[in-house]
Structures are given as structure tokens and as C-alpha cells.
Amino acid sequence: NSKLKTQNSKFLHEPNASIMKAGCFDELAAAYGVSPVSRNSHLFLSAEPVDGFPGRSFSIERVTTLNKRELRQALAGIEKANIATRNFPLSVAELRKRLKLKDGGDVYIFATTTAEDEHLLLISHKYQ
């Protein structure tokens, strides 16, 4: 079972382009009290919503591995989603094909690799 699943993270934060270019991820984590998913993912987690975060925030509905049975359960009822990959071995197109999902809708799936080298999908909705 993933450490990510058990650390009570309910919100995912994606920094905006200026933060990504500046690369000040440690400062961002300290200033907003968020934790990085891993060193190279540039996605951050928190247990509570973060006001004023410079980027987009999402509420995490489910976290799943690429295990077929787990995926089938996690994606039940989802026909389309916005997919982003960060530090992940598959491209968005490859992942979309594998998940058999159309583009769009209000579901956001972030595919990433944790610090423990575990490949995870974070299934979420935009927060506010």
C-alpha cells in the first residue's frame, strides 16, 4: 500500500508556469506548507486546502496504481478525463489509450512517480 495513500493528503497542487520556470520548489513547499509527491514530479500535496497557492488546486478523490483490477475499480463511471503526467514513464497519449478514456470533462488524472518509485494515478476534481 502506497505511503501517499496513507498520509491523509486530500489536495493536490500544481504550480503555475512561472513557478515551474523559476524552479523554487523547496521555497514553495515551505511557504505554503505543502509536501512534494517526489523530487522530480513538481506536484504537491496537503491535507487541507491551501489559500493563495500560485497554481491550480485539486481535491483528490482516489489514488490508484496501474494494477488492472485496482484501475478498473478506481475508474468506474469515468468516461473522459484531463490527463497530465509528471515524472511518469508513459506519455499522456499512451496513458489515455491504456485507460480507454476520452479527453475532457471535469475529472483530472495526474500520473506520477513517488519518491519510492511507485507509479500512481491521482484521480481528482478542480478545487474552487
Where in the sequence are the language-model features?
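SAM-dependent transferase fold signal centered on methyltransferase-like domains
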Residues: N1-Q128
